[in-house]
């Protein structure tokens, strides 16, 4: 959706993921329900999974991923980022935890055990070859709902509720205040109605509607209207 930039913060004050990575832009969720452009919500969920897994996803309009596909892909992304990839990695993580005197979860399942038989061989081989890419997402628990608990960059505290995160194509709408700002005192009038012209290009006046007129009349200041 289009919107205005209401606040620009230094990167260290931006909300950040559990592994310390800051967000670039935060959008108000009220921009979604009334406009009913729900595609962007599905897009942001799928983009998160695609980014974590490190590949592009093609999803044609009438033959694309449905909600369950997206949730399954998010599950897979979470397993890829946060579970050991194979038995070798599992053993290494267990040894590391023991060395540090930490408890390692007994029920930890490797990514290979979960997904090797489910995925195409090419996809699985690709994920296996590019597993270094997981470091960016390690320590970010990704739920089936695509939400993550963020911390406030200013206080370090967690926000009350989990927040939907992801990647969107976001374009700059070229309407800038510097080009729009305008004011006038006296200026050109319409020949026919003798009212001030409208718009910045004509050096026009601001429209003063019925209700604004009533506000002045209520204060007994109707003559202010002459200009």
Per-region residue spans from a language model:
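Long insertion/accessory domains within large nucleic-acid-processing enzymes
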Residues: 1-227
